[in-house]
Amino acid sequence: MARSAATWDPGQYLRFGSQRLRPALDLLAQIPLDAPGRVVDLGCGAGNVTAILRGRFPAAEIVGVDGSDTMLARARATAPECRFEQADFFGWEPRDRPDLIYSNAALQWVDGHPTLFPRLLSFLAPGGVLAVQMPAMHATPLHQVSRELAASGEWSGELRDVIPLPGILPAMDYWDMLRPRVASLEMWQTTYMHALQGEDAVMEWASGSGLRPYLDRLSEARKAAFRQAYAEAVRVHYPRRADGTTILPFHRLFMVARMAGERAIA
């Protein structure tokens, strides 16, 4: 089942744009296609990676798909030569079979992966590629602290109905799900040591992503109070170093699945 979309703030999300971009580039570097004709950026957000896909595949028709009208407005300005569609992941269907469905840090926002991933594979052209990167942070303090805080006495009345992020499946579940359906499958995990600058940097990072479902339920004054409470609680897990930097170890799961059939392989 698709989950309700959080309200997105492109400026807050892109505050750590360089750190968020690196995994997207690492995924792109492993795509085994020379010249795909149709490319979909699924969960394109503000369009920063969509523009990079345009540079990588200049002859392709590139379509960005996202559920947030705020993000899509930013994306259309960022990559005006690309086409954009508003849709949720379970409702979207391509007009024509894409050669590449690329999804960076997006599919973790929904559950139902045993249905969603085979569905995405079914859309691909022969020899097409599904390339996915998802954070694997559900069991870390980055998300545990927000869940615990929301369930505590001060906040439970306002936040009791917020459904936490579902967390992705174990890596081997994706292998077992995808491998029988594809000609080849590459999977790997990486831990990025994101070096964040500024006061309460982890809180600022989370405010652009994982805290959004909670912040959406609160008034402006209560948002500020929740952000401060989260900052104080998470600080012990991610302390500032002697040079003022905060290190956020961030685990990410990558997969590149290629369908059987003829495509231009690098």
Predicted regions and their residues:
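A conserved beta-strand element that flanks and buttresses the S-adenosyl-L-methionine
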Residues: 102
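Helix-to-beta-strand junctions that scaffold the AdoMet/dcAdoMet cofactor pocket
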Residues: 110-111, 124-126
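Short glycine-centered segments of the SAM/dcSAM-binding site in methyltransferase folds
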Residues: 38, 128-129
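Short catalytic micro-motifs in class I SAM-dependent methyltransferases
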Residues: 105-106
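Conserved class I S-adenosyl-L-methionine
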Residues: 1-37, 48-52, 71-74
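Class I SAM-dependent methyltransferase SAM/SAH-binding core
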Residues: 38-94, 115
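Conserved catalytic/acceptor-binding region of the Class I
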Residues: 114, 121, 129-197
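Conserved Class I S-adenosyl-L-methionine
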Residues: 46-48, 162, 166-266
